């Protein structure tokens, strides 16, 4: 990795470890194999006849055949199209059509995989360690109190660390998102858990000098999932964001939004439309910055910049040397 005057290409030379979202459960049919590209590599995701979803590296340990091209799931096993070797739910080879002695180390590289709330997630660790944390748990919200979840999706041509760091960069709210003061961010760190709280004022009209106070709480237990709660005297909103690296400079962002309902459904609809429009506009503003900035390993910070370096230290624990 080339370094010039404190400028580096990446936050890390490795991909982060943790649980990451790959797709909706409904996108993967029974006995189907899909090829996906994440973590700067190709993977396959398949579903057995009993309904179990599994993420695997795609190459057969025999002679390197790619199971994502004409491979087949038959019941609970997956077959390599090259020589017909079969692999069971543990990843080990269970049958060779033309041989009796199975090499004891003939095993596909399965990744820990779960399905939760209609989504398929996998655990990534380039050192191949078992998961040290539980997968993120999404909130189960009462539909009588909260609007139906709205799904938004972006491909951002920027590394994951740049995107998630925005949650603790409070001063940018004044310049990118039109806060009328200079917000401050407080940070609580407990192991792999982080909570960032920010309070900012936004004007609701050109003549409004005082503005409306909006409080934001961002929670995360790893780089792949962020829950944000936004509250003011006019709205309470929740966003749950899944961030999955495609490669070192591209991140898939999937966001699920909801707001707390007003007693009056017409008012709720008006607030929702306004919130959604502004959320998309704000994300696009951030996206432009993320995709055009560079990463500075040793930024020149002032006293008003807040806990950026503390946040980076927290995030670094998910990246192996």
Q: Language-model features: where?
A:
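Rieske [2Fe-2S] iron-sulfur-binding domain
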Residues: 2, 8, 21-141
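Non-catalytic accessory segments flanking enzyme active sites
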Residues: 9, 15-16
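A general structural signal for short secondary-structure junctions and capping/turn motifs
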Residues: 11-12, 35, 112-114, 244-245, ...
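Sterically constrained small-residue positions within well-ordered secondary structures
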Residues: 13, 27, 36, 46, ...
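A short, structural micro-pattern
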Residues: 16, 107, 114-116, 237, ...
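C-terminal catalytic domain of Rieske-type non-heme iron oxygenases
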Residues: 52, 128-321
């Amino acid at each position: 990795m080339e370094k010039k005057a404190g400028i580096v290409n990446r936050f890390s030379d490795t991909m982060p470890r943790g649980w990451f979202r790959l797709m909706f459960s409904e996108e993967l049919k029974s006995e189907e194999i899909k090829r996906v590209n994440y973590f700067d590599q190709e993977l396959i995701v398949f579903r057995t006849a009993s309904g179990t979803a599994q993420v695997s590296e795609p190459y057969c340990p025999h002679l390197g055949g790619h199971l994502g091209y004409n491979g087949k799931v038959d019941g609970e096993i997956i077959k390599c199209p090259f020589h017909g070797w079969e692999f069971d739910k543990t990843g080990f080879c269970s049958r060779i059509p033309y041989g009796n002695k199975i090499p004891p180390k003939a095993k596909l590289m399965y990744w820990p995989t779960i399905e939760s709330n209609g989504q398929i997630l996998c655990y990534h660790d380039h050192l191949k360690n078992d998961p040290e944390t539980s997968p993120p748990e999404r909130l189960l919200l009462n539909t009588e109190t909260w609007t139906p979840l709205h799904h938004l999706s972006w491909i951002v041509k920027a590394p994951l660390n740049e995107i998630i760091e925005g949650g603790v960069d409070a001063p940018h709210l004044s310049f990118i998102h039109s806060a009328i003061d200079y917000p401050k961010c407080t940070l609580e760190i407990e192991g792999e858990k982080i909570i960032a709280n920010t309070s900012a004022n936004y004007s609701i009209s050109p003549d409004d000098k005082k503005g409306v106070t909006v409080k934001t709480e961002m929670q995360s237990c790893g780089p792949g999932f962020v829950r944000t709660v936004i509250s003011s005297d006019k709205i309470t909103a929740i966003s749950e964001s899944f961030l999955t690296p495609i490669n070192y400079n591209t991140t898939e962002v999937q966001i699920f939004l909801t707001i707390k309902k007003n007693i009056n459904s017409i008012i709720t609809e008006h607030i929702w439309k306004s919130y959604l429009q502004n959320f998309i506009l704000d994300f696009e503003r951030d996206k432009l910055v993320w995709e055009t900035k560079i990463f500075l390993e040793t930024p020149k910070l002032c006293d008003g910049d807040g806990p950026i370096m503390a946040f980076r230290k927290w995030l670094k624990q998910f990246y192996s040397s």
